[in-house]
Amino acid sequence: EMSRGLGDVYKRQVAYAQGYDVKEDKIDEAMLKEAVETAKNADVAVIFAGLPDAFESEGYDREHMGMPDCQNYLIQEILKVQKSVVVVLHNGSPVEMPWADDVSAILEAYLCGQAVGAAEADILFGKVNPSGKLAETIPYHLEDNPSYLNFPGDGQKVEYKEGVFVGYRYYDMKKMPVRYPFGYGLSYTTFEYSDLQLSKEKIKDTETLQVSVKVKNTGKMAGKEVVQLYVSDKTNAVMRPVNELKNFVKVELQPQEEKTVTMELNKRSFAWYNTKVNDWYAGSGTYEILIGSSSRDIRLTKTVELESTMKIPMEIHTNTTISELMENEKAKEVMKDLVDQMMANIGGGEEGSAASEAISQEMMIKMMENSPLRALRSFAGISTVSYTHLTLPT
């Protein structure tokens, strides 16, 4: 397929050597020697590598992220005699790339159709400008994966303990170094982002937000860029990923051409699933809008204030803390007299006593704030009667 795509160029300028047997992970010295000699005498060595059926297929799970040793060894040996090495990968999922920093380029083809050879030739020879972006993070090692400690489990049960922290949500939250981040992908040209605009500075969760940004092709070749929009929740209501992809758009630009792209965000773009109401909930507060070329390449940011129209009922039980109650206006009304009494009791110790010197008033206040309701009966002289009659106005 590649030879047909290249036509006469293939016959005149391309020399081929097999290098390894795809059916087994074994170093064939004769094949290896031929490949090294061929690469040594070339201007550029293009190595096709990846995962054979024995390593990756439907019906069973991979046990590691490595490619066949014979392929990694071939790449390392060719790097000894050739500075310009391009690796074309055919694989259905991420692989470890111990040679990634040494090769000139990597073309990730994944598992394409029968015309993949011609498509790869068009990219390698500059007829087509690549514009794909990674839909997954490529970690350095299998052990970096968030599910590593829990999979495959005990043979009978697998626990999915990652929660929402899967993929880039995990790696970016932990600020872990990765081989290639989510949304990453190179081009033969370059793009510049500018003039991020939001349709509103404040919105309700019943409204939509229009986000626009200018993108310019600053290179010499026509190309396409995938502009990615991430949202970061700054309300601190619950633990959430540091940012989440909420929209994206692909724009084609001629050299030095600039266009404005617009994306829309709605309630779901800011929301998380709240089990107290069994619905998607976006809390009131500040949210950051981030525009980037990948999850690790953020170019522009702005903030928007969101007002929630959904009221979350407060569940009060014996383990509810004083600080949680004081954040609720109705609960604060009921708790005011009790809190005042506790504050007075905290400051009522005998002056100069060893206990007063050892435990500061600030420490006692922190202890009070973090104390559950059930502790009121013994904390700072609150009586059982006061505790029993603690009710909230409706």
Residue map of PLM features:
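Secreted, periplasmic, or luminal enzymes acting at the cell surface/secretory milieu
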Residues: 15, 90-222, 290-291
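Single conserved hydrophobic/aromatic residue that forms the stacking wall/gate
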Residues: 1-10, 389-394
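Intrinsically disordered, low-complexity Ser/Thr/Gly-rich stretches
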Residues: 165, 175, 187-313
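Glycine/threonine-rich flexible loop motifs
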Residues: 51-68
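Conserved, compact domain cores that house catalytic/ligand-binding motifs in diverse enzymes
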Residues: 322-384
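Low-complexity, Pro/Ser/Thr- and charge-rich linker/hinge segments at domain boundaries
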Residues: 307-327
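Short connector loops at secondary-structure junctions
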Residues: 4-31, 51-55
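An anion/phosphate-binding loop that grips the pyrophosphate of nucleotide cofactors and donors
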Residues: 42
